[in-house]
């Protein structure tokens, strides 16, 4: 069986306090400059809660996910996952977390089944445990049987995203970090992913942080919705509370009132910088 870190009964699922992260950007005119990705962000998630973070590309959503999953170190502040510090207790945190992102990481020459078997071994699962479980989970996420032995590099983004979701379901994470999980998916696959998120909550009691710019998705799935803009968390309330606060009829109107910008104005600058740092 997968070896989980002990979960303290009274610990918050996520507790981030004044979390800061900056990246260094090279500019031909101004030379090097520091660009804030997160600026004193504080956020808590209760166990079993689903919280959606809305933000444009470059708002800091991916940075927040990477910090909580120990892929990045914060420049300031602190973050704990079920009581474990993401810096000091990284190994314990990783045993409790699974991250599904738009740029899901796989061994590209290996097949979906091979990637899932590798993930299972990484999490301490035995061959006997995964022999029947992996085909069942691939079927659950709608992955066609005749594509399961193809190299990942031959698969579309949507297909790869389904494998990422299968990996998350296989390892039954206590905290599921979803970074744009439905980006690039067709409408049917998108609905399947949303049903998967509901299943993770109902069957596995997972806590979920959903980073997205799909307003309907956030409102349908999340208990609370946060608005993140240029590294600043402007609000974190229920969808109805956000609409009431900004005197808006829709979540989109509330987002525009909070940020002064719509999603059509989004830029990809900081996300590109993050990818450069992580490369």
Q: Where do the model's predicted regions map?
A:
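Conserved ABC ATPase "signature" region
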Residues: 98, 117, 121, 129-147
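Helical segment within the ABC ATPase nucleotide-binding domain
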Residues: 191-204
């Amino acid at each position: 069986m997968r070896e989980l870190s002990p979960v303290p009964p009274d610990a918050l699922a996520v507790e981030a306090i004044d979390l800061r992260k900056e990246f260094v950007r090279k500019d031909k005119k101004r030379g090097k400059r520091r660009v804030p990705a997160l600026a004193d962000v504080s956020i808590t998630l209760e166990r079993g809660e689903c919280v959606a973070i809305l933000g444009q590309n470059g708002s800091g959503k991916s940075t927040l996910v990477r910090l909580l999953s120990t892929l990045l170190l914060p420049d300031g502040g602190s973050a704990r996952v079920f009581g474990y510090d993401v810096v000091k207790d990284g190994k314990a945190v990783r045993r409790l977390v699974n991250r599904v992102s738009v740029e899901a990481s796989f061994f590209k020459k290996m097949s979906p089944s091979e990637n899932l078997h590798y993930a299972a071994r990484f999490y301490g699962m035995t061959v006997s445990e995964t022999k029947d479980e992996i085909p069942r989970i691939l079927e659950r996420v709608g992955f066609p049987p005749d594509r399961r032995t193809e190299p990942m590099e031959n698969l579309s983004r949507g297909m790869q995203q389904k494998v990422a979701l299968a990996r998350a379901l296989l390892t039954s994470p206590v905290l599921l970090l979803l970074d744009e999980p439905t980006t690039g998916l067709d409408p049917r696959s998108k609905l399947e992913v949303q049903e998967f998120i509901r299943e993770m909550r109902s069957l596995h009691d997972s806590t979920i942080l959903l980073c997205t710019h799909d307003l309907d998705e956030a409102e349908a799935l999340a208990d609370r919705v946060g608005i993140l803009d240029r590294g600043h968390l402007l609000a974190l309330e229920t969808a109805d509370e956000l609409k009431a606060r900004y005197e808006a009829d829709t979540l989109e109107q509330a987002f525009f009132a909070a940020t002064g910008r719509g999603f059509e104005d989004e830029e990809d600058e900081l996300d590109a910088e993050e990818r450069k740092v992580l490369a």
